[in-house]
């Protein structure tokens, strides 16, 4: 799912799939993820952004996880590792985030910025690390999205308030 990127994301994705969908950007990351989930067709959904990378060791660990994952697991959390060159969250270098989802569960993304899912399912915390290689400082964008949501009266989850405090 592309939200209007200008960094060749769609062209790169086309090397791996013909299932590329456009989503009009409405300042809401959770809406974009919910749209992406609606397009999924496999048993599990791996949720990733264009600036996230799996190195060889973690790619191998993810492939191995597929063979040992118990059927009652609904979500696998992976360590989100921020590259510190543009990172404003210096005190949160590595944290667990939900990244792999069982498709048959009705997960809903919440919060327009620092989006997450309601975690009522059975969750497995893996050792897999997703490297976040952001290309710039996203603080202005994040705060702008937060204030637009606030002005609309959208409830901001405690998790998001914590993320914003780290910025």
Predicted regions located by residue number:
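Catalytic-site signature of metal-activated, phosphate-bearing donor transferases
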Residues: 31-37, 48, 54-167
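Hydrophobic targeting segments
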Residues: 1-2, 146
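Acidic, glycine/proline-rich Ca2+-coordinating loop motifs
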Residues: 15, 19-20, 98
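Active-site nucleotide-sugar/metal-binding loop of Leloir-type enzymes
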Residues: 15, 34-44
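A short, glycine-/small-residue-rich helix N-cap motif at loop->alpha-helix starts
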Residues: 20, 24-31, 37
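A conserved acidic beta->alpha catalytic loop
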Residues: 2-11, 25, 49
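Acidic helix N-cap motif at the loop->helix transition within catalytic regions
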Residues: 7-16, 57
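Residue-level recognition of beta-strand->loop/alpha-helix junctions
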Residues: 2, 22-24, 79-81
């Amino acid at each position: 799912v592309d939200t209007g990127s200008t960094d060749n994301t769609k062209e790169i994705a086309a090397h791996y799939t013909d299932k590329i969908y456009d989503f009009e950007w409405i300042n809401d990351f959770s809406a974009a993820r919910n749209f992406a989930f609606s397009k999924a067709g496999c048993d599990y959904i791996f949720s990733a952004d264009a600036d996230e990378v799996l190195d060889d060791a973690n790619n191998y660990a993810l492939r191995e996880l597929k063979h040992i994952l118990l059927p009652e697991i609904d979500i696998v959390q992976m360590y989100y590792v921020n590259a510190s060159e543009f990172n404003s969250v210096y005190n949160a270098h590595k944290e667990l985030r939900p990244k792999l989802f069982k498709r048959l569960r009705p997960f809903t993304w919440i919060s327009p910025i620092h989006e997450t899912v309601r975690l009522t399912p059975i969750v497995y915390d893996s050792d897999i690390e997703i490297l976040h290689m952001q290309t710039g400082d996203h603080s202005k964008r994040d705060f702008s999205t937060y204030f637009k949501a606030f002005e609309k009266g959208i409830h901001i989850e405690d998790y998001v308030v914590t993320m914003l405090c780290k910025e």
